[in-house]
């Protein structure tokens, strides 16, 4: 995966990319928009000829208690075989309970039981995909800590690291989500990052949030805010360069604004760090 700053590619920006008006270092698309062929898949394959593409899923439901949706995983695998992406990523969440499916990223309680469940689902998904997944931490609006027996609780950062070490997946570290959660739930970003093994972090996401009645919402509809840029600079300075993506999914700006955000991230990468030397993400001896 390119150790550089890319951007999320959404349908309105495809023409600018394909006719050469916009030059991205690499792009990420939402897997579910391209699963079943048609003009959208054709446009994605054309974009793939211009630069690396990463697939980012929102519907695999790795935290679903009744197991992995194998049909959905097979559809993503077929897409990945066609696109040959630089990476395939998903969110650490659930989206189904029995027959009821929710079109959202629902938070998990971080506990031993859920760790076992998610690890099993990731393992099966990776077997179907025949490639490792990157797993992203999500923004949450319900504090699940009260639902967990303190004797079984696992801090979020330790949960992510344990998943990576157990399954061989990587961590997609969303710094905007960490910041949103720190304000909404009173958990410091520093305490979460202290539990995340940087060797397991293969990619970083940056995005903008909105504020409603004192609550921060991960809307992906704004430029990256100053506190998130500060977190990013500090992380890169401490741990080295990582592939970095600017997410912008709502109230889309002109493509040049999106590219300016990516250029700002690239300038930080160029200024603060040499490329990160890949290391194995193993449990400490």
From Swiss-Prot:
Superkingdom, taxonomy of origin: Bacteria
Protein's organism: Ralstonia nicotianae (strain ATCC BAA-1114 / GMI1000)
HAMAP family: UPF0276
Keyword vocabulary terms for this entry: Plasmid
Protein's recorded name: UPF0276 protein RSp1035
Sequence similarity: Belongs to the UPF0276 family.
InterPro entries: MbnB/TglH/ChrH, Xyl_isomerase-like_sf
Record PANTHER family: UPF0276 PROTEIN HI_1600
UniProt keyword Magnesium present: no
